[in-house]
C-alpha cells in the first residue's frame, strides 16, 4: 500500500490534551528528571543524529541505518574518517559543542564520548528499497574512553511471554517507555519538530511481536509485501476516539 509509511515516529497527544514537546511546560515529555540515564544522542560530524543505549562502559547499541550509508570503515576521527560520538545528557547540545571544540575528542565531564569503531549487520543493506530500515537494523559503537559514570542497560535475548489474554483497555499488558532523541510531534500532525538534541520519553503499550507483512495482510489482504522481519510494534491511539484513521490496530486504550 502506497500510503503506509514504514518509518518509526515518536508522537504524543497535542498541547492542552495532556502532553507537550516543550521543556518547562505542564505535561512536557522532555526526559530530564534524571540527567544521565544511559540513553544517548549519536552525532556524526557530517550532520546525522540518532539515539543509542549504553550496554557496557565501552559499547553502545544503536541502529544500523544511522551509519550503514558510510560503511564500517567510514568512521573515526583518529584515522581521518567521519568523526562520531555519543553524548548522554538530557540536553545533549552542550556535549556536541564540547566534542567539536575539543577536536572530536571525548569530554567525560560533559558525558560525551568519541567513537573509535563501529560495526553493523550487513543484512541491513540487503534490500535497497527499505533504505536501511527494518531488517537487521543493529549496530554497535566502541567508545575510545570508558563511560564509567554513565548507567548501562541489560539486554533481553528471548521473546516476551505471550499474554494469556488481550483486552481493550490494557491490551497485551506490556506497558513500555519509549525514550530517544530526534524528531517529535503530535498525533494529528506527525513528527514535524526537528532535532533539538533533547531526550524525550513517552509511554505506550506493546501491541505485538509481528512483521509488517502481518500488519498489511490484516489491513489490506494477502499480498507479497516483502516485509517479513518480526518487530515489536506499538500503535498510536486517538485519546478522544474520534480520528477516522484510528482503528486501534492492537486493541489497547490510549496512554
Indicate where each model-derived feature is located.
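Short glycine/acidic-enriched loop and turn motifs that connect beta-strands
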Residues: 67-70, 184-186
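Extracellular trypsin-like serine protease catalytic domains
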Residues: 200-255
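Conserved catalytic motifs of the protein kinase core domain
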Residues: 57-59, 136, 174
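Conserved catalytic-core segment of clan PA serine endopeptidases
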Residues: 11-34, 76-168, 172, 179-185, ...
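Protease-domain processing segments flanking chymotrypsin-fold serine proteases, especially trypsin-like
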Residues: 1-60, 70-83
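Terminal peptide-recognition signature
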Residues: 40, 52, 58, 62, ...
Amino acid at each position: 500500500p502506497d500510503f503506509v509509511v514504514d518509518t518509526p515516529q515518536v508522537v504524543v497527544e497535542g498541547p492542552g490534551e495532556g502532553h507537550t514537546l516543550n521543556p518547562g511546560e505542564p505535561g512536557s515529555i522532555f526526559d530530564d528528571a534524571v540527567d544521565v540515564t544511559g540513553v544517548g544522542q549519536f552525532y556524526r560530524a557530517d550532520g546525522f543524529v540518532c539515539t543509542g543505549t549504553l550496554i557496557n562502559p565501552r559499547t553502545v547499541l544503536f541502529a544500523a541505518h544511522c551509519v550503514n550509508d558510510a560503511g564500517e570503515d567510514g568512521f573515526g576521527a583518529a584515522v581521518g574518517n567521519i568523526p562520531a560520538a555519543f553524548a548522554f545528557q538530557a540536553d545533549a547540545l552542550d556535549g556536541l559543542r564540547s566534542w567539536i571544540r575539543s577536536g572530536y575528542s571525548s569530554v567525560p565531564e560533559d558525558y560525551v564520548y568519541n567513537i573509535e569503531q563501529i560495526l553493523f549487520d550487513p543484512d541491513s543493506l540487503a534490500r535497497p528499497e527499505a533504505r536501511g530500515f527494518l531488517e537487521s537494523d543493529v549496530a554497535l559503537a566502541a567508545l575510545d574512553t570508558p563511560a564509567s559514570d554513565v548507567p548501562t542497560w541489560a539486554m533481553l535475548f528471548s521473546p516476551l511471554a505471550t499474554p494469556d489474554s488481550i483486552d481493550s483497555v490494557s491490551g497485551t499488558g506490556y506497558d513500555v517507555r519509549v525514550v530517544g532523541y530526534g524528531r517529535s510531534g503530535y498525533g494529528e500532525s506527525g513528527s514535524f519538530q526537528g532535532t533539538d538534541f533533547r531526550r524525550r520519553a513517552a509511554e505506550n503499550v506493546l501491541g505485538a511481536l509481528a512483521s509488517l507483512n502481518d500488519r498489511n495482510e490484516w489491513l489490506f489482504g494477502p499480498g507479497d509485501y516483502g516485509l517479513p522481519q518480526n518487530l515489536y510494534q506499538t500503535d498510536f491511539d486517538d485519546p478522544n476516539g474520534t480520528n477516522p484513521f484510528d482503528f486501534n490496530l492492537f486493541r489497547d486504550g490510549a496512554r
